C-alpha cells in the first residue's frame, strides 16, 4: 500500500525561498534521542537554467529559479548543518542558450559543482550532442580544475558492449567516463552518517535518447546488484539512489515506484526525468521517493531520522 506524508512546497522566488521538502526542525536533544539524522537538498531536470527566469504566478510575472538562488538555499542550509547532503537527479543540460557551450565549457556540470552539489547522474538530454559531445563535455569538466560533483550510474552494460566490440562512439564515452571518474556508486561521510549514493538510467529515459549509443542493463536488476555490493563491502547507514527514471500516475508503470518496491533496501530515491513535483513523498515500505519539478523553479529539502531498526523516516 502506498503511504504518504504531508510536507511543504514553495517557489525559488526573489524575496522568499521555502523548501519543497521540509521534515521539520528538531532540537539537538530531540535529534540525539531519535537517532542519527541527515539533511538532504536536491535538484533535478534543471536543463541549463543557470539564470533566473520569469514565469506567471497568480496572474503576475514573477522571477524564479537560477543557480544563484539555489546556491543561497544550499549555503543557508549548510550554515545550519555543514553535513547536509546535496544531490541532483540528472538532465542538468539542454534547455537554454547555455547548452551551446555544453561540449567545450561543461558549464552546467561545473556550475553544479560551484553551488555545492556533491553527486549527480546522467539524464537522457546529456546525450543530445551524441557520444562525441558527451565525451568532450566530461573531458572539458575534468580539465577545468573546478570542484565537480561525482557522477554515478550503475546500469551501463559495458560487458555487453565490450563483448560485441566497442564502436567509435562507445569508445569515446568510455574514455570520457574514465577521465572524469564516473562510478557505479560513491560513499560519502556526512557527520556521523555514512551514505552510499548510486545512480540509474531509466527505461523511458533511454527511449527518449535516440542518439545514445550505450547499452544499459535493466535498472531494477542493476540497482539490486549494486545495493547488494554496497551492503557486502561498505559500512553505510543509508543508501540513496539518484534516478533518472521518474514516476507516473499509473503505479504499475511508474519506474521509480517499481524500483522502490523491488529494491526495498533503498532508503531514498531522488526521482528525475518526468519533471514531477511531489508535494509529499511517495513511500513504499521504508523507501521514500521525492521529486521537485523542473528548471530549478523549486528546490527539494528534507530531513531524515534513523529509526531504532536502522531504517530512516522523514
Named regions from a protein language model:
Residues 1-11:
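Bacterial N-terminal signal peptides that target proteins for export
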Amino acid at each position: 500500500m502506498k503511504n504518504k506524508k504531508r510536507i511543504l512546497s514553495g517557489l525559488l522566488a526573489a524575496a522568499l525561498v521555502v523548501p519543497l521538502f521540509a521534515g521539520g526542525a528538531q532540537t539537538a536533544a530531540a535529534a540525539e534521542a531519535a537517532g542519527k539524522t541527515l539533511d538532504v537538498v536536491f535538484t533535478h531536470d534543471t536543463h541549463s537554467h543557470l539564470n533566473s527566469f520569469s514565469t506567471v504566478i497568480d496572474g503576475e510575472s514573477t522571477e524564479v529559479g537560477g543557480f544563484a538562488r539555489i546556491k543561497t538555499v544550499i549555503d543557508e542550509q549548510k550554515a545550519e548543518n555543514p553535513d547536509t547532503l546535496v544531490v541532483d537527479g540528472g538532465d542538468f543540460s539542454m534547455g537554454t542558450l547555455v547548452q551551446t557551450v555544453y561540449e567545450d565549457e561543461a558549464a552546467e556540470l561545473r556550475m553544479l559543482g560551484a553551488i555545492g552539489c556533491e553527486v549527480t547522474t546522467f539524464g537522457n538530454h546529456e546525450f543530445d550532442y551524441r557520444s562525441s559531445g558527451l565525451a568532450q563535455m566530461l573531458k572539458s569538466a575534468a580539465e577545468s580544475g573546478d570542484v565537480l560533483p561525482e557522477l554515478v550510474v550503475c546500469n551501463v552494460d559495458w560487458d555487453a558492449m565490450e563483448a560485441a566490440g566497442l564502436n567509435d562512439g562507445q569508445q569515446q564515452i568510455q574514455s570520457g567516463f574514465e577521465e572524469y571518474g564516473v562510478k557505479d556508486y560513491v560513499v560519502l561521510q556526512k557527520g556521523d552518517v555514512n551514505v552510499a549514493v548510486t545512480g540509474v538510467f531509466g527505461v523511458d529515459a533511454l527511449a527518449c535518447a535516440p542518439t545514445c549509443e550505450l547499452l544499459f542493463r535493466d535498472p531494477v536488476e542493476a540497482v539490486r546488484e549494486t545495493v547488494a555490493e554496497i551492503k557486502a563491502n561498505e559500512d553505510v547507514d543509508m543508501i540513496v539512489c539518484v534516478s533518472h527514471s521518474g514516476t507516473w500516475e499509473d503505479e504499475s508503470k511508474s519506474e521509480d515506484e517499481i524500483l522502490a518496491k523491488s529494491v526495498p533496501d533503498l532508503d531514498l530515491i531522488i526521482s528525475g526525468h518526468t519533471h514531477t513535483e511531489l508535494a509529499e513523498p511517495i513511500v513504499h515500505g521504508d523507501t521514500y521517493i521525492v521529486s521537485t519539478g523542473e528548471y530549478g523553479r523549486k528546490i527539494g529539502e528534507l530531513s531524515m531520522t534513523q529509526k531504532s531498526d536502522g531504517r530512516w523516516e522523514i
